[in-house]
Amino acid sequence: MRKHKFWLLAGLVVALSLALAACQPETVTVVETVVVEKEGETVVETVEVEVEKEVVVTEVVEKEVIVDPTECNLDAPAEEVELNMIGWSFPITDFYAEELRKCDKVENINVNTNLLASADAQEQVRLALSAGGDSPYDIVHGANAQVGEWAGAGWMMPLNDLVDKYWDEYNLGDIPEKAWEGVTIDGNIYGVPIVGNTLHLIYRQDVYDEYGLDVPETYDDVIEDCGVIGLDNPDFDMPFTINLSAGWAWEIEFFQFLRAYGGDYLDENNMPTFQEEEGVKAVEKLVEVADACMGMDGYSFGLNDQEVAMQIGLLPGTNMWASRAANMSDPERTDLVDVIAYAPAPRVVEDGPRAGSAWNDFYMIPANTTNDPDLIFRVIMEAADERSQRDGAEIGMVTRLSVAEYGGPYLEAAGQTIAEGIGIYDKDQAVGIVRARLGEFLPLVGTGEMTPEEALNAAADAYIEEATAQGFIDG
């Protein structure tokens, strides 16, 4: 018997697709009909055959995009952009420069930071922006004194629209109104406050205990304490320091003492008043402190010298910047963390204001930048957002209220100094001329070349001549 087998598909038609790796084959039954031809008749037989079928399963997976708050979280601009920043170096501004450089990791953004000594950085800004034309800088670091000088001259861009635009996104209300006021002229906001600062007392608690000294409340107390410790004490470089190592340093110390005596730089007509009785008293008190506590060597003892001397135990006390105080609680920098203590700045007059000024540092955008101000502002804000300032609070005095708990042990002393101190510079462009002329003549008192009266009168005469030429005083 010849048997011919014809296969007919009578069951399911299986559509096969690519399976996911995790899917397992499914067994199904296929019915096949077999036709068998026999002699004289045709017989149809039905046979069930098991085959494997692959099942395709589509699985939807939601993947969370994790944003690292410590990084610069900006979208890449369409075209390559180079941003240049200039400022001056101290620990907290070094930190912010590193935060700015994080935006260098964003595709098409290149960030260059240039940190110089303060006087050098300010001079570079003046030279670059006073000439007109395109600014070589996109981000400029300035402090209170530069607001009146640089923004008042029209060199800086008002940022009101950008502050309003990004107020919620970057929680700019977390920065106190007083800090914004410090960078505002006639309603125009010219910068983002990134640093709070003042000068306050830093001292060795163990040394003061050893000599039976209380924390000084006035500079007369400081002078008395220096007499107890001794200017010629072999254990120390000197008993106490203020900073008179440069012209700009003399001017800052003089400003604090002058205001504490009730004086000021200018009257309502921009005529000088700093050479009057309060000014003479201020210079005389500075010299009295220097002679009693520092000696001639102290006149050249700069900020870095003072900081290191405190850290290695060669200086019992100083009135120093809060921005430097953070290093005093760093065990990697000093073995004296447990005995270094902090107090508000002394007064020059009992029950008068503390001889400590209030400062902020700002990032500003030059008016003639060639890059997109919106992008520049966002780069600044990525460097000064809440997480950045939380980390920065461990290094210096930042501006956001929400991160105060992360700051160092000096913050209470710094805050009390600001609250009870002499305030900020007036935001008058003419004040920049005053500061420059005082920085020129006051050091001559320290060298003995001029008396306090002679130096102040010389500075006043030079100021009047320059301010008149520039139109700040009617001729």
Positions of predicted regions on the chain:
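Hinge/lid segment of periplasmic solute-binding proteins
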Residues: 68-77, 144-198, 214, 223, ...
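Short, solvent-exposed loop/beta-turn-alpha elements that line the ligand-binding surface or hinge
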Residues: 75-76, 160-175, 234, 239-244, ...
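Extracytoplasmic "Venus flytrap"/periplasmic binding protein-like
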Residues: 99-175, 206-217, 307-309, 313-317, ...
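A structural signal for short loop-to-beta-strand junctions that line the ligand-binding cleft
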Residues: 127-130, 135-140, 168-207, 351-356, ...
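Extracytoplasmic/periplasmic substrate-recognition and gating elements
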Residues: 130, 211, 284, 289-294, ...
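Long, aromatic- and glycine/proline-rich binding clefts that accommodate carbohydrate-like moieties
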Residues: 175, 340-347, 392-444, 469-475
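Extracytoplasmic/periplasmic solute-binding protein
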Residues: 181, 185-194, 199, 223-272, ...
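Glycine-centered hinge/linker elements that transmit conformational signals in sensory
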Residues: 225-230, 268-299, 345
